[in-house]
Regions:
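Short, low-complexity N-terminal leaders and the immediately following helix N-cap/first helix
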Residues: 17-98, 353-377
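Flexible glycine/proline-rich
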Residues: 54-59, 63, 68, 81, ...
Length: 382
């Protein structure tokens, strides 16, 4: 049976380590109802709200999400602007066949022409300079010969407004240029600067703490014993946050499978964070303490287990306006649940308009069989 995979994970972005073996506790009910994927995603998004807005200088707002529209404070361009170095003339003179003009001066960008340019006269003009009233065509300097005070132009089919970027051609005064909910990319920062938006309202940074749980984990620089593995999940997550200027992420450490140690670490993370992400310890093993510890910390569970693979044991809860995610310890599960649950929640808290990840539909390279009813995520190469 062929089926279409509508969600992809980039193999190159995943940590390549062996996942810990999960020993299931028979005392735990394995028949916890699985929430369908779409309902699980919707439950997460219903539970989170955009954070408050702050006003920042434009140069500090790159990458943040706008909370107000950016509108043009004047037409752009604000005047008829020469698009070429050349000679500004009246189109009516060209239409009559006139090609030899008396040049009355030179106008550079950043200056205004104070005199008059009468019929039969022209003005030498630089790129970016304002074209004086009454002149409505510019001929390139390459198509001219200067003869003392006179200039002869060589043009066969002159058009009105040729080589002139007309006033308001890009936008009108008051026109919305950037919508609230858009991220301030470099090009949008340039647009905001062009219309004088020196300070902008953006969602304040989402404060995130990442905690790795598991007695089998050691730091990246450590020499692991044969029964230990290096913590790659937190490195993966922290690297993802480097891509998000609107998120301020910190690492809460690697915590062993000890309820008291976990409670101390997660309580501290909750105090300083808008979102806490903990990896590992959310399944049904005897040492999977995260759900109970989070309950003791006052976190109300809103989602436990979704009908997906990998990532079925995903856990989500809230404490007031704070969001808490418990992600399964398998690295591919971390990547999948981060993309499908954590990232949309982060985007909503940051004030983004579009929060769900994009879907790219491509044909499979080979037939794939699916023997279960779960929404399945598979690693792909990009």
């Amino acid at each position: 049976m062929r089926f279409r995979i509508s969600h992809r994970l980039d193999r190159d972005s995943l940590p390549c380590i062996n996942a810990p073996i999960i020993i299931y506790n028979p005392r735990v009910d394995k028949n916890v109802a699985l929430t369908p994927f779409a309902k699980a995603q919707a439950a997460v998004l219903r539970a989170v709200k955009p954070l408050p807005a702050v006003r920042l200088p434009l140069e500090q707002a790159f990458g943040f999400v706008l909370r107000e529209h950016i509108r043009a404070d004047r037409p752009l361009p604000p005047f008829n602007r020469s698009a070429m170095d050349g000679y500004a003339v009246r189109h009516a003179d060209l239409a009559k066949g006139l090609r030899r003009f008396r040049c009355v001066g030179t106008l550079e960008a950043g200056a205004a022409w104070r005199g008059a340019v009468r019929p039969g006269e022209c003005l030498k003009i630089m790129t970016g300079a304002p074209v004086p009233p009454g002149l409505d065509a510019v001929e390139q300097v390459e198509k001219s010969i200067s003869d003392g005070p006179h200039v002869e132009l060589f043009t066969d089919a002159p058009e009105r407004w040729q080589h002139i970027h007309r006033m308001g051609a890009d936008c009108k005064k008051g026109e919305r240029l950037i919508a609230a909910g858009e991220t301030l990319t470099p090009s949008r920062v340039a647009v905001a600067a062009a219309v004088g938006a020196a300070r902008v309202a953006v969602t304040r940074a989402v404060r995130v703490t990442v905690v790795a749980s598991g007695s089998e984990l050691v730091g990246v620089a450590a020499a692991p014993a044969p029964y230990q593995i290096r913590d790659s999940n937190s490195r993966f997550l922290m690297a993802r946050f480097f891509e998000m200027p609107w998120a301020a992420a910190s690492f809460g450490g690697v915590i062993p499978d000890d309820p008291r140690a976990l409670r101390r670490a997660l309580a501290a993370a909750l105090k300083r964070s808008d979102m806490v992400i903990v990896t590992g310890g959310v399944s049904m093993g005897e040492r999977d303490h995260i759900p109970e510890v989070l309950k003791q910390c006052g976190v109300q569970n809103r989602l436990y287990k979704s009908a997906i693979r990998p990532g079925k044991p995903v856990w989500f809860g809230v404490k007031g306006a704070k969001a808490v995610f418990g992600l399964p310890g398998n690295p591919v599960s971390v990547a999948a649940t981060f993309r499908e649950f954590v990232l949309p929640a982060l985007r909503k808290m940051a004030g983004c308009t579009a929060v769900l990840p994009s879907v790219l539909r491509l044909p499979l390279a080979a037939p794939a069989k699916k023997k279960h009813a779960l929404r399945e995520f598979r690693v792909s190469r990009s």
